[in-house]
Amino acid sequence: SNALDKGGENFKRLYNDSDATQRNANGQTRSGLYSLFIPMEWNYEGYIDTYGFPVFDTPEKPVEGPDGELITQGVIEYWNNEVDGLKSDQDGLNEFYRQFPRTTKHAFRDESKQSLFNLTKIYEQIDFNEDLKNSIQVTQGSFQWENGVKDTKVVFVPNKSGRFRVSWVPPVHLQNKRYLKNGTNHPGNEHCGAFGCDSYDISGTVDSRGSNGSLHGLTKFSMEDVPSNMFFLEYIARPQTAEIFFEDVLMACVFYGMPILVENNKPRLLYHFKRRGYRGYSMNRPDKKYNKLSITERELGGIPNSSEDIKQAHAAAIETYVESFVGLKESGYGDMFFQRTLEDWAKFNINNRTKHDASISSGLALMACNKHRYAPGAPRQKPVALDLGIKKYDNKGNTSKIIS
């Protein structure tokens, strides 16, 4: 099958537009076609009996195939054994899933050579989330000002058409925690986590396919009753106006009481925060000291996306998180439950970041929670001098002496 950027993405869109369960009043799907997916176990050579039926499970007695050969193993057991044998080869495993898919997720995987991150771990997490689809505690909803009065308290309202997806809500005593400093609101739970945001400035686009606004919330280790290193909020949407998006982001920050790191190449969101009295929520770029910031950066906060160093640090932050907290670990599976973000990580291209809104904002959240790593003058790990056991001698005179 083709890579997503070589026709695979178009076919995936056609397949999704042909879902027979999503039809209009005239009984038509969006494409006018019906999609059909046949898993590999239904027609895998060597595992079909003489009557043409697939041998799914390992039979108690050998089953005869159409060529007279005996079938002693079920095709599903065979497939699982192949998967187990490729666990240490992430590229080979990914290609096996693509060529012999048992789910549509397998069939529409991208080529692993295109991916910057560990695809095995990402798809392990995606498959785990798929299996637990009905039991994962991800709630869709909206944030609202209490009684509609701005700058009071924010409440979360579950709503099937809401733009937010949330997997954790702080205990009541941590909600809406903020304090005033120099006449500006500051977050009260900065020690618990942070947000990252990829914003946009223009309300509409000509083809209605402009990039989405994206927001991610991430916790960090703290002594509070808060899960550590967990993405708890995902927002990937483009409301009718940019102002709605700005207010959505502001309400999320106020509700969780956490600061936010925003790309400052599109500054309208940052101006919105400052105008509303929440400049204290907008983080300054962590890689520069305050006296080295530009006038605009001091006024608004935020971080540029044009620097190559920032791009590399951003990608490295996601890579480290995937290796440590995504997929199967010794203690079980990771608690990254947002499928759209995982899928965006899987196809992230550092040289063409425009389409990857979810990756941008999630990476900024990771940088915000680990800002000490990017601080100028942060301690660098010095290379350790190795003692090879070779001594130096002073050979002057009749007797050698050890120098070191």
Regions found by a protein language model. Give the residues of each.
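RNase H-like, metal-dependent nuclease domains and their acidic two-metal-ion catalytic environment used
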Residues: S1-N10, R23-G32, Y44-R285, S324-S404
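Short, charged, low-hydrophobicity "junction" segments
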Residues: K12-R13, R163-W168, K289-E299
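Short mixed-charge
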Residues: N16-G27, K289-K292
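Conserved AAA+ ATPase "SRH/arginine-finger" region at the nucleotide-binding site
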Residues: I38-N43
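Short alpha-helix plus adjacent loop in nuclease-associated cores
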Residues: S282-L328
